[in-house]
């Protein structure tokens, strides 16, 4: 039986190695238990910071896109507005001329 136990037992260097690994895992576990809330707060803050940066970039690019649209489309909008205004002015002038002729006819 003793010989059988000797065959199963590992050499001391291997046992020391496994003991060191288990102590490392225990220290990591203790560190996690001690700083669990701090780690959660840190993770929440980093995630919030990433979200804020992404939202800021999205807003920046959308504002830049709207600025480009305004810069390039403003002349087109101005010309269409001018044409619309000219068309309205012509119509108004025609209506006024007709009214003024009628008023002159009525007055005379």
Swiss-Prot record:
GO cellular component: membrane
Membrane topology: Single-pass membrane protein
Disulphide-bridged cysteine pairs: none
UniProt biased composition (Basic residues): 88-101
Primary location class: membrane
Coiled coil (residue ranges): none
Subcellular location: Membrane
Keywords: Membrane, Transmembrane, Transmembrane helix
Residues annotated as transmembrane: 39-59
Region annotation (Disordered) ranges: 88-108
Name under which the protein is recorded: Protein alpha-1
Organism (species): Adelaide River virus (ARV)
Organism phylogeny: Viruses, Riboviria, Orthornavirae, Negarnaviricota, Haploviricotina
């Amino acid at each position: 039986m003793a010989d059988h136990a000797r065959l199963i037992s590992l050499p001391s260097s291997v046992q020391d190695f496994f003991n060191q690994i288990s102590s490392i895992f225990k220290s990591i576990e203790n560190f996690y238990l001690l700083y669990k809330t701090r780690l959660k707060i840190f993770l929440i803050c980093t995630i919030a910071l990433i979200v804020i940066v992404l939202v800021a970039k999205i807003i920046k690019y959308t504002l830049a896109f709207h600025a480009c649209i305004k810069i390039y489309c403003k002349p087109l909008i101005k010309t269409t507005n001018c044409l619309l205004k000219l068309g309205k002015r012509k119509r108004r002038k025609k209506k006024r001329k007709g009214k003024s002729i009628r008023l002159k006819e009525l007055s005379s």
